[in-house]
UniProtKB/Swiss-Prot annotation:
Example of a GO MF term: Hsp70 protein binding
General function of this protein: Negatively regulates MHC class II antigen presentation in dendritic cells by interacting with the molecular chaperone HSPA8 and impairing its role in lysosomal antigen transport. Does not regulate the levels or activity of the MIR155HG microRNA from which miPEP155 is derived.
Tissue expression: Detected in dendritic cells (at protein level).
GO cellular component labels: cytoplasm; nucleus
Subunit structure: Interacts with molecular chaperone HSPA8/HSC70 (via N-terminal ATP-binding region); the interaction results in reduced ATPase activity of HSPA8, impaired interaction of HSPA8 with HSP90 and reduced lysosomal antigen trafficking.
Name of the protein in question: HSPA8-interacting micropeptide miPEP155
Keyword Iron: no
Protein species of origin: Homo sapiens
Keywords associated with the record: Cytoplasm, Immunity, Nucleus
Cell location: Cytoplasm; Nucleus
Induction: Up-regulated in antigen-presenting cells in inflamed dermis.
One record GO biological process: negative regulation of dendritic cell antigen processing and presentation
Length: 17
């Protein structure tokens, strides 16, 4: 799992795991 990617997605408003 990409931590940076996950954080970026979550910050955008998308919860992608």
């Amino acid at each position: 799992m990409e931590m940076a990617l996950m954080v970026a997605q979550t910050r955008k408003g998308k919860s992608v795991v």
